[in-house]
């Protein structure tokens, strides 16, 4: 079964992404900041601008992703607040090997759930990033770059939720 799952592109991508990240928590937090936080900050403003352009130019077409630019603007703000909380509070505490991280980690997981909901809204507005047959270059670029952004954000969330956070969450041992 494992061999079969590893043959699937998505399963292979997930395994590869988490296998290639540092396992040491301090190194992992620096990796997340340098790789994911920097990339999100670089990518999102361009995506907002491109979405606004596509919406304005193609506002008379039925497939136009109406409201996408606004969704992305909201995401810029939400992600910036989330990343700042990690960079200023959670990650420094992790680097100090602080205890009692359950509360900030729970807050970060809740933010991750909110980000997943935002991704679903984006997919709904874009019909799962399905381009119309006559899509222009800007529209095509928007969906291509948006797909890459979503993959990066999902990887970012997965690495924090599945690799980083479990190292600091208290384990509840049940007597059986």
Model regions: which residues?
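Small-residue-biased structural context
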Residues: 1-176
């Amino acid at each position: 079964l494992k061999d079969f799952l590893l043959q699937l592109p998505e399963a292979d991508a997930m395994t590869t992404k988490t296998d290639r990240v540092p396992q040491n928590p301090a190194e992992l937090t620096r990796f997340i900041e340098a790789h994911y936080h920097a990339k999100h900050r670089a990518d999102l403003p361009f995506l907002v601008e491109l979405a606004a352009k596509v919406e304005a130019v193609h506002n008379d077409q039925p497939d136009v992703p109406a409201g996408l630019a606004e969704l992305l603007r909201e995401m810029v703000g939400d992600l910036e607040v989330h990343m700042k909380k990690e960079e200023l509070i959670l990650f420094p505490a992790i680097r100090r090997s602080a205890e009692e991280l359950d509360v900030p980690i729970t807050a970060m997981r809740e933010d991750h759930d909110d980000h997943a909901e935002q991704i679903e809204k984006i997919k709904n507005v874009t019909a799962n990033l399905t381009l119309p047959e006559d899509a222009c270059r800007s529209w095509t670029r928007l969906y291509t770059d948006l797909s890459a952004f979503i993959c990066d954000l999902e990887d970012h969330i997965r690495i924090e939720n599945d690799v980083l956070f479990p190292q600091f969450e208290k384990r509840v041992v049940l007597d059986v």
